[in-house]
């Protein structure tokens, strides 16, 4: 029986890269996101390559929608096709918005980051993990960030949400220590995706400046790390992985080449 991976935020960036990597690795895919058109396009691409894919359209901030969508997996054609449960949950959905001083930030940006990066992750964990415990198998991979290790200038709330991801990952690992389930916190540094465009509310020039003078990581690099962790032997729990671009030392020290 093929393993099944559920990936949140699968329509772009690290989530989309994880979908392709796990498809190549022979997994069945449950892909979630807010953009139905992008999900359908990715599903078609992966199905054409031979993967088994089901898409679920919802926002992880909507607890009722997330719960209903996940519960539906145990009904209908997908269940009839041999679906036994989620083997790997990749809590990828997340974002940064704005880069202002803490006393000048946008309330709306704060709410969106907290509701997505923390509450959304908690919702998916609460909905999926009990069934993993019942089955006696499963792996939760949370996409954290180097930003969760220490705050950087004007990153305040985003850094706080990723620090929360670390704490939640560590706490869940403790809660599951008596089970065969594993928990991994993957902490990327600079990854060139649509992350910075989103942070700067569509200002591509400002987003591009984030990566000037350094070769950043790609979504594929992080997807490879996630796949490696998921495929490790059952007795091996890769608890935490910090992945940085070669010229990035931590969240604040980056050497940039100048022309």
Please give the residue ranges for each predicted region.
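Residue(s) in the substrate-gating loop at a strand-loop-helix junction
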Residues: 145
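Substrate-binding pocket helix/loop in short-chain dehydrogenase/reductase
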Residues: 100-102, 106-114
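Conserved glycine-rich Rossmann-like NAD(P)H-binding loop of the short-chain dehydrogenase/reductase
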Residues: 27-41
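C-terminal helical subdomain
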Residues: 185-189, 205-252
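Conserved glycine-rich cofactor-binding loop
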Residues: 11-12
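The beta1-alpha1 cofactor-binding region of Rossmann-like NAD(H)/NADP(H)-dependent oxidoreductases
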Residues: 37, 57-71, 107
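Active-site helix of classical SDR
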Residues: 125, 161
């Amino acid at each position: 029986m093929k393993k099944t991976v559920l990936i949140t935020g699968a329509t772009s960036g690290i989530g989309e890269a994880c979908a392709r990597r796990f498809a190549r690795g022979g997994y069945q895919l449950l892909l979630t996101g807010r953009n139905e058109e992008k999900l359908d396009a990715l599903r078609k691409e992966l199905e054409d390559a031979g993967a088994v894919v089901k898409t679920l359209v919802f926002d992880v901030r909507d607890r009722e929608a997330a719960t209903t969508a996940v519960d539906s997996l145990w009904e209908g054609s997908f269940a009839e096709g041999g679906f036994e449960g989620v083997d790997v949950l990749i809590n990828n959905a997340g974002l940064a918005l704005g880069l202002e001083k803490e006393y000048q930030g946008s309330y709306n940006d704060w709410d969106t980051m907290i509701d997505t990066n923390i509450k959304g992750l908690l919702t998916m964990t609460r909905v999926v993990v009990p069934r993993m415990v019942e089955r006696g198998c499963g792996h939760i991979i949370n996409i954290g960030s180097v930003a969760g290790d220490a705050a950087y200038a004007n990153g305040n709330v985003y850094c706080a949400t990723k620090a929360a991801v670390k704490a939640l990952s560590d706490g869940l690992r403790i809660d599951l220590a008596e089970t065969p389930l594993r928990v991994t916190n993957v902490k990327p540094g600079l990854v060139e995706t649509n992350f910075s465009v989103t942070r700067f509310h569509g200002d591509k020039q400002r987003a591009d400046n984030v990566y000037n003078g350094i070769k950043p990581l790609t979504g594929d690099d992080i997807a490879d790390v996630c796949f490696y962790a998921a495929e490790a032997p059952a007795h091996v729990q890769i608890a935490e992985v910090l992945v940085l671009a070669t010229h990035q030392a931590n969240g604040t020290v980056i050497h940039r080449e100048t022309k």
